[in-house]
């Protein structure tokens, strides 16, 4: 059975945080505090290292019952029995990834505009990662779509989606107000002085947003 996903606080890793094993303490702190979904993204690691790190991240996610998504690599997602995979526009087509991982896999697709969102929906994606919402040091070669871009995507598709790119405690609410189901966050969590406090603040804002919608 496909897992029910809460996209509200979607933690995404980055290569820069894998310089030493302290990353696993950071991830555990975030999971304890209430991260709802975790994506293992590590663009520069070799396949064997990707696999070994993914196993460690998967063990943490299992401990706190948080689904794990693997960035780009359907083979790694299959190998570690992750909940699914997140695909960029230049990665495997979603239909092929689903064939590899099965009908219960959670397939996410990056979308920068309404056309890409509709294409992903037609290709059986389960959710979208939309951005960059704001300028970000994590991905310097990406275009900024702003909250206006999120609103256009929200109007075009019924798929759940998260905003990604430059999202912080200060602008998280604006992302939700633009129609997003949550936000994919890297530096604002993993680079925080107090990871637990940061995640708890995000969690409170997400709960407030849900109560307003109800």
Identify the function of each model-found stretch:
Residues 43, 133-136:
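A short, flexible beta-alpha/helix-coil linker loop
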């Amino acid at each position: 059975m496909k897992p029910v996903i809460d996209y509200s606080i979607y933690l995404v890793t980055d290569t820069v945080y894998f310089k030493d094993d302290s990353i696993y303490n950071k991830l555990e702190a975030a999971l304890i505090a209430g991260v709802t979904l975790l994506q293992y993204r590590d663009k520069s690691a070799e396949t064997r290292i990707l696999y070994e790190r993914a196993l460690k991240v998967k063990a943490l996610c299992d401990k706190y019952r948080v689904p794990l998504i693997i960035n780009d690599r359907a083979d790694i997602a299959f190998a570690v029995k992750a909940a699914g995979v997140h695909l960029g526009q230049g990665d495997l087509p979603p239909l092929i990834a689903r064939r590899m991982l099965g009908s219960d896999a959670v397939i996410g697709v990056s979308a920068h505009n309404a056309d890409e969102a509709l294409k992903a929906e037609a290709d059986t994606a389960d959710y979208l990662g939309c951005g960059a919402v704001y300028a970000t040091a994590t991905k310097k070669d990406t275009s900024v779509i702003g909250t206006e871009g999120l609103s256009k995507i929200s109007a075009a598709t019924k798929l759940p989606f998260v905003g990604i790119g430059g999202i912080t405690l200060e602008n998280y609410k604006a992302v939700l107000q633009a129609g997003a189901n949550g936000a994919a966050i890297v530096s604002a969590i993993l680079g925080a002085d107090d990871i637990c406090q940061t995640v708890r603040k995000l969690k409170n804002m997400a709960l407030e947003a849900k109560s307003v919608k109800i």
